[in-house]
């Protein structure tokens, strides 16, 4: 049963009666006193809101309503007190489906003809559709424009593909006003006016005579950049925009900025100064010889190798021996006379060699001393007064006499009084002999290839302890005897470091001497 609400007026005092039906056997009639209703009902609009065309009007259909919440009313309710509440389920702005064909406003072309959309006699709507009444596709316009779709679009006289103005009318409007909407060239415009002249973007470039000459942006000489930056422009250094137009479609291109692509100054070689008088000849060349240990011997106060103030300094690398021998020759005469008054004790062979060398010291001393090469620790070049022993041949000073004797034997006389007991090699200095004897190695063991029958019988040959050669023995000793042999062998090796005789044969000695580095005789 459809339920109905009652709208009450403000000044009405309703009366409620319960009238029992005749079918029921009730023997009393109940009567309720009237009650004043102080509340007012909400006014409800009686007209229907806008809705979708095909959508029905829904009414509220309550399924269950409690009788205690209902206001009792008289059974014969008047007709004017029966309004119906209508609820709209859909909003009018959301009734458009996603698959509907919507058309927005057309994009106008670059046309020189200016006309208003209100000039059309049948124009009565906004360009942008606001509802779905006129959302029908324009089949007639599409068929007429499809013929010129594949035209030559590169020509400036071709019509634009986007119409300048589209009237949102039904399809019947195009059949009635077909002569008004479309012209002979399929460009929508007014019928009495000619086709609109479309502006070609390629003709929008400004000619070169419209503006004065601009400065060039290309890389050039430094003098040209100075003139350009100062404002002294020459017509020969400018560019014409008309020359660049065919290759670049009317848009001029710019060359790189100042000196950004110059390859001369960014090459792998060292950059040279070209704008000053400083040449490469007057600059100092730092080579590997400039950072040698020769510079460490110079003291800032007593250095004899002070740089000259000549115009050009010769930077050729000088041999270390020649640079050390050069100042010594100039001081030879003074040092030779001063060393004669000092007491010296020389051997007989050293005195004879020095007397024979002093007879022609002024004539042949320079080539002989320059050719010799000094070995060992480098001596200081400063003249120390504490060094009282001076060599008469090369004016070298020493603090001890044995150092001076060693100097004569190693450099001047080439006397070799020290001989190796192992190989018989002679040396002029005792320290060289002791260093040589370490190479023999008194405790070295000569290893040989053993056969399979030797592996079972191994022992150390006791008489040949000096040579230390491992040889097989007839019977193998026990553990205690083998330990005693090893202990005695180690003690013998430690005691015979320099006094042991060589146990090598001649072939081993010759092969060892070939490996040694020989001194220049």
From Swiss-Prot:
Listed Polar residues bias regions: 336-346
Induction: Expression is induced by the HOG1 pathway.
Gene Ontology MF: a single term: RNA polymerase II cis-regulatory region sequence-specific DNA binding
PROSITE patterns noted in UniProt: ZINC_FINGER_C2H2_1 (PS00028), ZINC_FINGER_C2H2_2 (PS50157)
Keywords: Cytoplasm, Metal-binding, Nucleus, Repeat, Transcription, Transcription regulation, Zinc, Zinc-finger
Bias (Low complexity) ranges: 347-358, 494-505
Subcellular location: Nucleus; Cytoplasm
GO CC annotation terms, alphabetical: chromatin; cytoplasm; nucleus
Annotated region described as Disordered, given as residue ranges: 312-383, 494-521
Highest rank taxon of the organism: Eukaryota
Recorded phenotype for the gene knockout or disruption: Strongly affects the production and secretion of liamocins.
Annotated gene: MSN2
Native species: Aureobasidium melanogenum
InterPro entries: VerF-like, Znf_C2H2_sf, Znf_C2H2_type
The protein, known as: C2H2 finger domain transcription factor MSN2
Zinc finger boundaries on the chain: C2H2-type: 389-412, 418-440
Entry function: Transcription factor that controls expression of the genes involved in the biosynthesis of liamocins, glycolipids (also called heavy oils) composed of a single mannitol or arabitol headgroup linked to either three, four or even six 3,5-dihydroxydecanoic ester tail-groups. Targeted genes include the liamocins biosynthetic cluster genes PKS1, EST1 and GAL1, as well as related genes such as the ABC-type transporter encoding gene MDR1.
């Amino acid at each position: 049963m459809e339920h109905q609400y009652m709208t009450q007026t403000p000044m009405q005092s309703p009366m409620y009666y319960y009238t029992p039906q005749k079918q029921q056997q009730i023997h009393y009639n109940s009567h309720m006193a009237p009650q004043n209703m102080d509340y007012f009902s909400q006014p409800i609009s009686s007209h229907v809101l806008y809705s979708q065309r095909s959508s029905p009007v829904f009414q509220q259909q309550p399924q269950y309503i409690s009788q205690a919440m209902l206001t009792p009313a008289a059974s014969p309710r008047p007709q004017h007190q029966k309004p119906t509440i209508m609820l709209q389920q859909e909003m009018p702005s959301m009734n458009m489906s996603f698959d509907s064909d919507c058309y927005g406003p057309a994009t106008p072309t670059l046309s020189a003809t200016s006309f208003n959309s209100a000039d059309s006699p049948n124009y009565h709507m906004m360009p942008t559709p606001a509802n779905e009444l006129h959302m029908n596709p324009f089949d007639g316009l599409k068929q007429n424009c499809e013929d010129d779709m594949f035209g030559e679009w590169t020509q400036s006289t071709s019509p634009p593909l986007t119409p300048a103005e589209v009237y949102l009318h039904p399809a019947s409007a195009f059949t009635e006003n077909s002569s008004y909407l479309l012209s002979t060239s399929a460009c929508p415009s007014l019928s009495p006016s000619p086709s609109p002249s479309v502006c070609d973007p390629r003709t929008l470039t400004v000619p070169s005579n419209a503006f004065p000459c601009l400065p060039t942006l290309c890389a050039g000489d430094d003098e040209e950049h100075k003139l350009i930056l100062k404002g002294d422009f020459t017509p020969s250094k400018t560019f014409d925009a008309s020359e660049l137009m065919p290759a670049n479609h009317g848009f001029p291109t710019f060359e790189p900025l100042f000196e950004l692509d110059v390859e001369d100054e960014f090459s792998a070689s060292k950059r040279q100064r070209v704008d000053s008088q400083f040449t490469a000849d007057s600059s100092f060349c730092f080579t590997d010889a400039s950072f040698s240990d020769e510079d460490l011997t110079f003291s800032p106060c007593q250095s004899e190798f002070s740089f000259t103030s000549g115009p050009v300094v010769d930077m050729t690398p000088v041999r270390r021996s020649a640079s050390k021998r050069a100042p010594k020759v100039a001081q030879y005469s003074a040092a030779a006379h001063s060393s004669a008054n000092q007491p010296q004790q020389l051997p007989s062979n050293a005195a004879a060699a020095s007397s024979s060398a002093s007879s022609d010291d002024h004539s042949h001393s320079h080539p002989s001393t320059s050719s010799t090469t000094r070995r060992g620790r480098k001596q200081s070049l400063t003249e120390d007064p504490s060094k009282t022993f001076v060599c008469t041949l090369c004016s070298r000073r020493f603090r001890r006499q044995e150092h001076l004797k060693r100097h004569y034997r190693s450099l001047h006389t080439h006397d070799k009084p020290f001989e190796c007991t192992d190989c018989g090699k002679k040396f002029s200095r005792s320290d060289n002999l002791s260093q040589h004897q370490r190479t023999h190695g008194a405790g070295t063991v000569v290893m040989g290839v053993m056969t399979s029958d030797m592996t079972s019988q191994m022992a150390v040959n006791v008489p040949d302890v000096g040579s230390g050669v491992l040889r097989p023995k007839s019977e193998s000793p026990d553990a205690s005897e083998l330990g005693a042999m090893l202990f005695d062998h180690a003690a013998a090796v430690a005691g015979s470091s320099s006094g042991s005789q060589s146990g090598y044969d001649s072939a081993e000695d010759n092969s060892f001497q070939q490996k040694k580095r020989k001194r220049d005789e």
